[in-house]
Amino acid sequence: MRADREELDLPPPVGGVAVDVVKVEVPATGRTLVLAFVKTCAVLAAVHGLYILHEVDLTTAHKEAEWEFEPLAWRVWLVVFYFGCLSLTVWLLEGSYGGSDHHAARAQSPDVRARRSELDDNIAQMGAVHGLELPRRQVLRHRGT
């Protein structure tokens, strides 16, 4: 049973037991890892598609003497696919979906330097209030004994 039941917006259920509702958030590192994985898979799929289309283009060029069909149709699709892959690669390497997600994730990262300076300030204040406690050896050396 919660001691601070008064802070809840909803009254506790029958039986007097309150339930905490917690908003589950995915950490920024997890989101970044999944996004990098998806981008890598997209680039690999694009490269694989380029390889297959290149092989088809080479195969049609070798069989061109035997068959009478129009290789221009394959070349148009190949150019369209090249353009699509290049656009996808530039978009993925740019790393932003409008710029908001990438910059928001960077803004939420903890500032370690500020936390360290805050810790140093707290230590300095504790030393000023309580006095510095030196180990016994240092005190004896300082006295000269």
From Swiss-Prot:
Asked if the keyword Transport belongs to this entry, the reply reads: no
Tell me yes or no: is Lipoprotein among this UniProt entry's keywords.
no
Q: What Pfam families has UniProt attached to this entry?
A: Adeno_52K
Report TM segments: none
Q: What GO terms fall under cellular component here?
A: host cell perinuclear region of cytoplasm
- Where does the UniProt entry say this protein principally localizes? host cell
| Keywords tagged on the record | Host cytoplasm
What does its record list under induction?
Expressed in the intermediate phase of the viral replicative cycle.
Compartments annotated for it: namely: Host cytoplasm, Host perinuclear region
Q: What else is known?
A: Expressed from the major late promoter (MLP) and produced by alternative splicing. Only protein expressed from the MLP during the intermediate phase. In the late phase, this region is spliced to allow expression of all late proteins.
Protein's name according to its UniProt entry = I-leader protein
- According to its UniProt entry, this protein's organism is Human adenovirus C serotype 2
